[in-house]
């Protein structure tokens, strides 16, 4: 890896000052919400306007998809499934749920049977006390795939989902045809990991055991302040997407347990160092946003895989699917359909 990549901050489009300001705004928002609650007389107190009052039911996928659940590793995993052809499993990341893929489902389902789960810890999936290391979370997905009767799959993961997808491919490589890693990086894989960890303040905050309790009940304020920090396009989500993502994290335990994905990074790093001793052999697409992970993801992926190709999503920050839907769809289809 080139020397100049060692100093990439993972947010080279944002200065450290901008990150600190964003963090400060987040904390001020939380403090303001707490203060207003304390100052409101009991007789005038009103129920908070949460997504659970505004949107009780989960969002629906396209008409040719359905909601379903499966019990895997002793917990319930929710997923949507639809389409025809070979299976393609799509794994979401933090700040979103299965619905992050909704724009892509109509076209992808013309070519694949698409399965998009909610990871353990968020949305309609269970939220157990433990099991948030990516090795275990990958096992959840593998058990789901087995229950559905598939012997091999195509696989894509974004953000935390990238980490889960890698852990899946590393453990069950013989059953993965192709894998797309989208706009994040792998804990423990150096030299990039240490540089990113030092500059991405949310890694520490989210991994702090009390963080979920701080954000609980303020999911809308939290997410709407966080999304722009790692994005590039202004307001990339539709109102429906924002409402669904907020609702998914406002479910009981949603933020508390999703933050455990970050709390498991130390264990993930240990697991990844072991996984990386045997490089992935299946084709791997490193897909990064022009203003986010594209700066390093291809070289980073080559540390763990032998057959790496690249997709740089033009004009995009971290939220690839929403910031440049057309190119993401085009490049994923080109990769997964190529013989």
Language-model segments: which ranges?
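Basic side chains
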Residues: 14-16, 35-36, 120, 134, ...
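Short regulatory "switch" loops immediately downstream of catalytic or recognition motifs
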Residues: 1-2, 267
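Alpha/beta-hydrolase fold catalytic core
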Residues: 2-28, 33-86, 110-112, 306-309, ...
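Residue-level signal for well-ordered alpha-helical positions
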Residues: 44, 104, 299-300, 323
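Flexible "cap/lid" subdomain of the alpha/beta-hydrolase fold that forms the substrate-access gate
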Residues: 55-68, 74-77, 84-87, 115, ...
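Conserved HGGG/HGGXW glycine-rich cap/lid loop of the alpha/beta-hydrolase fold
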Residues: 75, 81-124
